[in-house]
Amino acid sequence: MFSQQEVHDIIDRVIGYSKLPGCEVSVQWTEDDFIRFANNGITTSAFRVTQQVSITSTTADKRRGNAVVGEITAEALKNGVKQAEDLAAISHPNPEDMPALPAQSYPSLSNFDGYTASVRGDVMVPQVQAVLAGALKNKLVAAGFIQRSANAVGIGNKAGLFGYHTYTDSSLSHTMRNAEGTSSGWASQSSVSVKDLDGEQQARVSIEKCLRGINRKKLDPGKYTVVLEPAAVADLVGWLGAAFDARDAEQGQSFLSKPSPEAGQGKGAGPTFLGEKLFPEIITLRSDPFHPKLASTPWGQSLLPSEKISWIERGVVRNLYYDRFWAEKAGKKPTPDTANLVLDGQDNSLSDLIASVERGLLVTRFWYIRVVQPKTWQLTGLTRDGVFMIENGKVTDPITNFRWNESPAEVLQRTTKLTQPIRVNTVDSGPDVAPALITTDFNFTSISDAV
């Protein structure tokens, strides 16, 4: 693993080769093991060490070029700088490009597990064996992926900025299908520590869903009360983070914009719902890089120090995301990215939520999520790996999958109950922490034949 001094030396070397006014360097070192399995057997395993240096060069008139190199040699770094500077020379100026950040005070995060960093892939084999044993015992077919990684990252620029961080991560996800391929169950788990992965417990979840999902019934599309499991909630919440962009809100292009003839007309910032209660009191959405379950970094894409920020607090919109350009234009303090999202929960179990629903649907997770209407943050997607009828507080029949159209903001506005949150790896935005929830009038638009 690259030490702090080694990362510093690499950045200094790159900056030393730079001839343009601006040079920003990002260094990534990763050691990882993975095991892939399918058809009830291990198909692939690997141990890899990768290193990458990303170089961004900036001219005096705000032209930028970027190059990425995978070798840490003088020749490779020099060529990377030259490529970045050549690209900058032919790029169009970006009037919104901001001056390089000076030295920052980055927080110290505790998401490095020494055991996970030191072991190899053999420690993950028992978890895979537990999943495969469960599949064989129940005459199902398992496929999945398990991995662990140790990472060192660093950033620096000509203005004196420097940051260094190490973290570990691990995950196990898999699906179970019946031999006929008509039913699918899924389970996933991720953690900073590979010791937390539990293949036997995961297999129980996926097996139960797969066996319960055989002989699915068709249900007419429409609006239903739903219990969304944490994976489904995290997929929605991950998309919602981008909707807190202050520029969109102030220019009338967001669900956080108030109706105004001035918004987006070049007459300054329009009114927003900042400080107003748009959600039930049980809804609190925040960014928390210090959360022990998240493999966060001390900085975001803007390179500003990561910090705890409440976006929604007890139903009230507390903050908007200001990038450096829009913050300067609006006279505001820039804020870090809407990353490391945590949707707080309540002291309920998934069983408690199901028991409180007279008639509705239990949804495992979503996929193929796309934006339909950016202003209202309307999304569309599909359910997968288990949709079940809830009747009189009990899970009954398996149901075919659906296509849905929904705004995650409106889903939270209609939420009535939550469980305790867990870490979930989302389909599109990486790990977040989310609970299961009950929401009403979830809009299913058509039946999907997907399993």
Describe these PLM feature segments:
Residues 33-51, 147-172, 315, 368:
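Conserved alpha/beta core surface patches that mediate binding of polyanionic ligands
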Residues 13-15, 42-46, 119-122, 130-136, ...:
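A generic local secondary-structure boundary/capping motif
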Residues 48-60, 163-189, 311-313, 385-392:
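Short beta-strand elements
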